[in-house]
Amino acid sequence: MSNPFAHLVEPLDPAQPGKKFFNLNKLEDSRYGSLPFSIRVLLEAAIRNCDQFLVKKNDVENILNWKVMQHKNIEVPFKPARVILQDFTGVPAVVDFAAMRDAVKKLGGNPEKINPICPADLVIDHSIQVDFNRRADSLKKNQDLEFERNKERFEFLKWGSQAFHNMRIIPPGSGIIHQVNLEYLARVVFDQDGYYYPDSLVGTDSHTTMIDGLGVLGWGVGGIEAEAVMLGQPISMVLPQVIGYRLVGNPHPLVTSTDIVLTITKHLRQVGVVGKFVEFFGPGVAQLSIADRATIANMCPEYGATAAFFPVDEVSIKYLVQTGRDKEKVKHIKQYLQAVGMFRDFSDSSQDPDFAQVVELDLKTVVPCCSGPKRPQDKVAVSDMKKDFESCLGAKQGFKGFQVAPDHHNDHKTFIYNNSKFTLAHGSVVIAAITSCTNTSNPSVMLGAGLLAKKAVDAGLSVKPYIKTSLSPGSGVVTYYLRESGVMPYLSQLGFDVVGYGCMTCIGNSGPLPEAVVEAIVQGDLVAVGVLSGNRNFEGRVHPNTRANYLASPPLVIAYAIAGTIRIDFEKEPLGVNAKGQQVFLKDIWPTRDEIQAVERQYVIPGMFKEVYQKIETVNESWNALAAPSDKLYCWNPKSTYIKSPPFFEDLTLDLQPPKSIVDAYVLLNLGDSVTTDHISPAGNIARNSPAARYLTNRGLTPREFNSYGSRRGNDAIMARGTFANIRLLNKFLNKQAPQTIHLPSGEILDVFDAAERYQQAGLPLIVLAGKEYGSGSSRDWAAKGPFLLGIRAVLAESYERIHRSNLVGMGVIPLEYLPGENADTLGLTGRERYTISIPETLKPRMKVQIKLDTGKTFQAVMRFDTDVELTYFHNGGILNYMIRKMTK
């Protein structure tokens, strides 16, 4: 079918008639000029891809009529220009593709039809752990261990890059996916097949939104959805409301981009932006560098929006030149965006589009702050940190409470480390990590940390040796400018050696703490602290022994490491006392903004980016030496504990079955609010007494070889055993934190996997009860695949985080939502009832279904299949089954 909008096509430059674009101004529709810039990107993609099948003319009209339709809950298709994956989510995607090829072959189709149509980049950044720190060879040793642990996964990924077209792999050691995307992969404008069009993407990592800081529309999706996009399917999304976030004023000289983003995170959580786009505008935006904008856009999942968009302006264009992009390409990028009405001047208010709602922040009101101790939205001013931590100590167990009895607030424990005596107390810092895509891509905060380290060393300060310090930059570029500017030796002297290029501590790959430290924490029952420049600090994520974790800017991470405790008021108390007996305060060593900018201007230069990135795909010799099979179908190794053919498609036929009601289901878990995907499917270490550990031990592995759950995502047997295996899981059946539940027929307390297995052996269906924001956090597809394998047919919750709900749909698990004002408490549900959920043969989006209990009580819930496309996936038993049937016909 030809495109009904073909008449909009014209050359961008008459001198190059072969280079065309869809000129949206030729629509001659006054509504276009008042659309938010983010919605203009959706509109262009719909017009360019309009085939009257996947994308219909009516979809284009709905997007153009955004001002009215944003309130109508209507779905629109979106075909992004590309996909990015990281290795933890990328391995299961390639496993699924390999298994889908097998399934298509088995059903009589051509397996090579399973191939990415949409270009995909897979960046390996999640595997490296902080095993070695505080030594010059930490990086080399951690990278060697990474290869030793992950050889089989890496070989499999290398096979995938050869077996599938359109899939590029960025080897380990290159940097963090979002920074590599910002500095290297992002096109801003595509120039492909004779057409210019806006760069846009979805990624299998929730912090994909970082790229919105450069004016590239992108957000995180579940791995399952990303696979469908790679196979040419559009994403089906509800046309979002767009909140205009107006920035005015100039930030105070002592304030960092981290302080601004933590302030915005708290503010937008209060405004309520889940499922919406946020678009930044106003004169304050022009004051922010691309690194600052990217930091703000990065934490979009923490404030709950789908995307946090900064349209392209002159600052974006300068950044492209600064990062070594081709000057001719940059010229065409600006020319195209101006021609199509997508280039922004933030000082010109006549360009301000319509928004659903406008909120404002005056940057001069931002103060230095941290967030914690358990959630990124719980912002605390640095001046209040001591007082806030001490009130959390005694407060009842919760997001801001540890329930330590008042007479134990000053407990402490002495221990011996490296033949010296030290003391730990509540609030002692045991992990200090400069880590994560949020901050390590920002030269101003990284150089700020380096200059602070230099001044601290010059003033005679040091960091206690038992504190686990680490620096994991987002790319080789960071190391380059830290080294060239001369601050690296000072960072090393304080223990902040480069330990690897990857997510590391931010995703729980913090590695072990010294045994003496763990012993002191456990014996003293102490609330020990991790301070990190990360973006998430949910319980049990950073390290099992740090009950309090605070997000802070890189300079503050160093400051708290030097202080050794969170219980310090920097204004009144010294950071430390030097050998001369002089007290040194934080204000004495805090670098000024002018100092930082002078160093940044001198050392962050285009040549550096070119040098790092021109050899990115070949620089890792260990990767180059890996052997990988060349077959188009993967030859599964039955002995492998990393890569296993999943059971998802074993019984798949070409015929569709009508939907079945769920009869007499038991509740596997009865959960509360804010259950994260970390609770459902942890990414960190495999506990020695867990079902997954027993599985690995039975196959002859020692605990040293267990690796992490994240690295085992290519093996469904381990991931099923790791489902709900987080030690911080709070199940109302037990009233304590444990990865366990009650097997209701027998009354026994079992590990969640063992209980689920028992129910499945008896042929009994399962559901999960939950509260608000079920599935918040990382875009973890195993948080939907795992429950599916445990036999969970439905989840009944008060509300869902966007990505997780669509992942459940993608696996054929029914997301049910209580009616407004109702929940387990108001309905008097204990979770010990048996549930029958009536599912009619004819389904409609967001329809209500009847739930009947064995007590005789009945109530209704909303079936959260939000679009017709989602219902199609459900009828097929999930999105991948749908794709296999489609590719086989």
UniProtKB/Swiss-Prot annotation:
Substrate binds at Q86, D205, S206, H207, R536, R541, R699, S779, R780. The keyword Transferase does not apply. Binds 1 [4Fe-4S] cluster per subunit. CDD domains: AcnA_IRP, AcnA_IRP_Swivel. GO terms for molecular function: 3 iron, 4 sulfur cluster binding; 4 iron, 4 sulfur cluster binding; aconitate hydratase activity; ferrous iron binding; iron-responsive element binding. The keyword rRNA-binding does not apply. InterPro entries: AcnA_IRP_Swivel, Acnase/IPM_dHydase_lsu_aba_1/3, Acoase/IPM_deHydtase_lsu_aba, Aconitase/3IPM_dehydase_swvl, Aconitase/IRP2, Aconitase_4Fe-4S_BS, Aconitase_4Fe-4S_dom, AconitaseA/IPMdHydase_ssu_swvl. One of its GO terms (biological process) is response to iron(II) ion. Transmembrane segments: none annotated. Its EC number is 4.2.1.3. Coiled coil: none annotated. It holds the Pfam family Aconitase_C. Keywords: 4Fe-4S, Cytoplasm, Iron, Iron-sulfur, Lyase, Metal-binding, RNA-binding, Tricarboxylic acid cycle. It is found in: Cytoplasm, Cytosol. One of its GO terms (cellular component) is mitochondrion. [4Fe-4S] cluster binds at C437, C503, C506. It catalyses: citrate = D-threo-isocitrate. Its cofactor is [4Fe-4S] cluster. Interacts (when associated with the 4Fe-4S) with FBXL5. Interacts with frataxin(81-210). Bifunctional iron sensor that switches between 2 activities depending on iron availability. Iron deprivation, promotes its mRNA binding activity through which it regulates the expression of genes involved in iron uptake, sequestration and utilization. Binds to iron-responsive elements (IRES) in the untranslated region of target mRNAs preventing for instance the translation of ferritin and aminolevulinic acid synthase and stabilizing the transferrin receptor mRNA. Belongs to the aconitase/IPM isomerase family. This is Cytoplasmic aconitate hydratase. It comes from Bos taurus (Bovine).
